[in-house]
Amino acid sequence: TDDIFSDSYPTWNKNGEEIAFVSDRGSYVDGEFFGRIEEHNYSQTDIYIVNINNAKIKRVTNTPDNESYPIWANSERTLFYTSDYNGVYNLYKHKLVETSKNDSALNEAYAITNVLTGLQQPTISKDDNSIIFAGYSGVGWDLYSLNNPLDLESKKIEPTNFINTRDDEDLTVADIRDTDKIERIDLNTNSKYSKW
């Protein structure tokens, strides 16, 4: 790519002719961008594929959510990636089907995980039998595996409370240096919460 948009997390498909990647380009997949970048929503990302033989870019996802970390399956034309659809990054499966126009259809992707704290950086085994990813648990990040990801059924995930109420809440930034606004925790109570 050679434009003003941010492109990241490139990953080759098995035959080496396509690269899936993450971008904030929105609908700008060909031609020049004549708008003003400060008026472009560069905070939202989708998954795209570029064919290295003709440099054509195809948009795979088109959601208001942030998709990231695409990885190709090796035995079929399927992408896995993370999405924060419900406010937490879960793993999604997206089978790509060729249409008569030789474009990847925007098939509906579906979640194959429903985690509480999010996951990142998935990678798939050569035989497609396992996906390893980083997930947050307790006080840090750990590695987890998911067996037979191509065979997993859709998981129903509900939007988190943050997503359900994000338009209702005051999300203004507070200056925490103003000590009058800081809630103090009494460290001498028998609270069920950690002092850390």
Name what the model sees in each region:
Residues 15-17, 75-77, 127-129:
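Short coil/turn segments that connect the beta-strands within blades of beta-propeller domains
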Residues 51:
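NTP/phosphate- and nucleic-acid-binding module
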Residues 77, 98-106:
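Short, solvent-exposed loop/turn segments that connect beta-strands within catalytic domains
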Residues 150-196:
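Outer-membrane beta-barrel initiation region
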